[in-house]
Design a protein with these regions (language model features):
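Extreme N-terminal starter segment of soluble prokaryotic enzymes
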Residues: 2-7
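Conserved N-proximal alpha/beta basic substrate-recognition cap immediately N-terminal to
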Residues: 11-126
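Short amphipathic alpha-helix with an adjacent loop that forms part of the alpha/beta core around
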Residues: 53-62, 132-140, 173
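A short beta-strand motif that forms the metal-chelation/ATP-contact edge
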Residues: 62-67, 198-201, 267-279
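Glycine-rich phosphate/pyrophosphate-binding beta-alpha loops
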Residues: 71, 155, 215-216, 274-284
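Rossmann-like NAD(P)H-binding beta-loop-alpha module
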Residues: 116-145
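Phosphate-binding site of ATP-dependent enzymes
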Residues: 156-250
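ATP-dependent carboxylate activation and anion-phosphoryl transfer catalytic cores
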Residues: 236-304
Length: 304
């Protein structure tokens, strides 16, 4: 007998039921989760928030475990990977385990490119590689680039580098490659000028969008680094691309977020596809919570 239908997965930092005065970060998380929980309740589903890493949780009590704000997983990736294997034997994961494993490593961008999705060009440097940054930039012709881990979030170890000072950045790259695989991408000037547009999809269908803008003098649009997000009305071209990306996933995800920019040649290109624990800004467009809940109902019906 299941005690609850849905576990909304968070991490230990965000398990409080109420945000302290001035804690806008937790307040945003709770606002989004409450919108989703209310929509689930209207469809007859019970739900509770739970720390994914809590060893006391009996996951067999839930019909499914739904990823929401597990924002420390990339810092505990080995632990998280082992947890996935255990929990998917006890309950259903949403999005499913294979999708989570695929999307947890930025090598997925190469798969999307092979499936005809326009993505920002990427070069992968595997852990232990001795390739230099100067070699990569010379080979690609990129004057400026962004360096980040293949398994990451919140702009962890994300650096803007350039060809002129590549030698100075090499010790940093070497230290990172000693621990993990890295991705190098050309710096996209449109991020600094305009920002990054983020489109949300449920069951492959677009619902709403935001524009993320970096603070002056920075290129990182994450709120951890002073970035801001605002409601945004995307173009038809952007909506078409977002739904094309969702259709290129196998299976089509229950929920997802597609981050895109105008690349340095003026073409629309995907920066990231977030299928594990994306912030979805339901509070900016509450009807999206209804689409999300409907997707969870359909997921449970298909996987009962």
């Amino acid at each position: 007998m299941h005690s609850f239908d849905v576990a909304l997965l968070t991490d230990r930092r965000y398990t409080a039921r109420h945000a302290a005065e001035g804690d806008w970060y937790l307040r945003n998380i709770l606002d989004d989760d409450r919108l989703l929980q209310a929509a689930l309740t209207r469809r007859g589903l019970t739900s509770v928030r739970a720390d994914w890493a809590d060893p006391e949780v009996d996951w067999s009590r839930f019909r499914c475990a739904l990823f929401r704000s597990t924002w420390d997983y990339h810092e505990r990736f080995a632990e998280f990977s082992a947890w996935l294997g255990r929990v998917e034997r006890a309950t259903r994961l949403c999005n499913p385990g294979p999708t989570v494993r695929w999307n947890g490593d930025k090598h997925y961008l190469a798969d999307l490119a092979e499936r005809g999705v326009p993505v920002v060009p990427s070069r992968f440097l595997e852990r232990g590689s001795t390739r230099t940054l100067a070699e990569v930039l010379a080979e690609t012709g990129w004057d400026e680039a962004v360096l980040k881990p293949c398994v990451s979030g919140g702009a962890r170890h994300t650096y803007r580098v350039n060809r002129e000072r590549a030698a100075e950045s090499q010790s940093l790259l070497a230290a990172l490659l000693a621990r993990e695989s890295m991705i190098v991408q050309p710096f996209q000037a449109d991020i600094a000028r305009t920002g990054e547009d983020t489109l949300v999809v449920f069951g492959g269908r677009y619902t709403h969008a935001v524009r993320k803008v970096a603070k002056p003098g920075d290129f990182r649009v994450q709120d951890d680094h002073g970035g801001k997000a605002h409601p945004y009305s995307p173009t038809d071209e952007q909506v078409e691309l977002a739904e094309h990306v969702a259709a290129a996933c196998h299976p089509v995800p229950v929920y997802g977020r597609i981050d895109m920019v105008r690349d340095n040649d003026g073409r629309l290109a995907v920066m990231e596809l977030e299928l594990i624990e994306p912030e979805l800004w339901l509070r900016y467009h509450p009807p999206a919570a209804e689409a999300f809940a409907a997707g969870v109902v359909a997921f449970l019906a298909e996987n009962s």
